[in-house]
Amino acid sequence: KPDYAEAYSNMGVALKDQGKLEEAIAAYNKALAIKPDYAEAYSNMGVALKDQGKLEEAIAAYNKALAIKPDYAEAHLNLSFELLSSDRLKEGLEEYEWRWKTTKNVETKRQFSKPLWDGKKNLKGKKILLWCEQGVGDTVNWSSRLPLILSLTDYCTLECQEKLVPLLTQSFPNVEIKAQDRRHDSLRDDFDFHMPMGSLYKHFIPEISQNTKPDAFLTPDPVRIKFWRKRLESLGNGPFIGVSWKSSNISPQRLPNYAPLSEWSPIFTIPGVTLVSLQYTDFHDDLTEIKNKFGVSVHNFDDLDHYNNLEDVAALCAALDLVVSTTSTVPLISAGVGTVTKLANWRQ
């Protein structure tokens, strides 16, 4: 069936996932030649163009999809990412609200009887509930702006992933930090307004624009920082550099962010430093490969649960001189505690 537009679009998705971006775009164009009003093909093409670094062309493709299908939530969400990457903050954050209408997220939105805060209602004397969405790293990132909410109210509760409770409690003593609990959402009466954390930025665009890089906002236990400094000194001489080369979440979409270990040679071969692993999953074989390939040891503290004990991970990061990492929770924590952090952005 040579005029099967959907097959060409599906082929494009498969080619894109294999990193064959030019071939993927050619497949999408074939689909559109057959079916010019094919919104999904335009949106898929936008993703491939984005992966090529062609942000303006990607934005144009998403807008074509939306001209055909104005309520296409996935295209709105994809558009939001490219607008934000293009520093079009206000437009991008408005489009980001469409995330709740996508197939992936529609079931995860919490349903309360209390109203969503619109950014305009006076919060003086009122209590607001902020609730986490998506991953641990997102929660850490968004928590950097909690002081903006605290400038409007003295009564703020944040419900987050359980393993973040100790670290965020230590860092934000004026916020009630609790593990998320969705069991009785519709019956709750312990707050006046609520808001998902991903909507926080939208209501503070002027403040964020003036201060795009907030100061250290995470506060690990000073006793644990001192403990980890002594542990580091037992390994050898500094500077002590923490490294993390992959995430536990490696989907086809995220795979381009994570380079093979061979690409890390400029870091692993720095002379006169002590390297420390900040990996939290599937890394023991990697440590052996690094030793065999580069003749260097990346030290790992086996008694530290990097995945769950984030309070101690933050303390270790604070004790380090530098962190080099790919996109994951690690650089958000290390930058959050004020340690110089370099992000290895392979996709770009």
Which residues are covered by each model-predicted region?
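Alpha-helical solenoid repeat scaffolds of the TPR/TPR-like class and their adjacent stem/linker regions
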Residues: 1-348
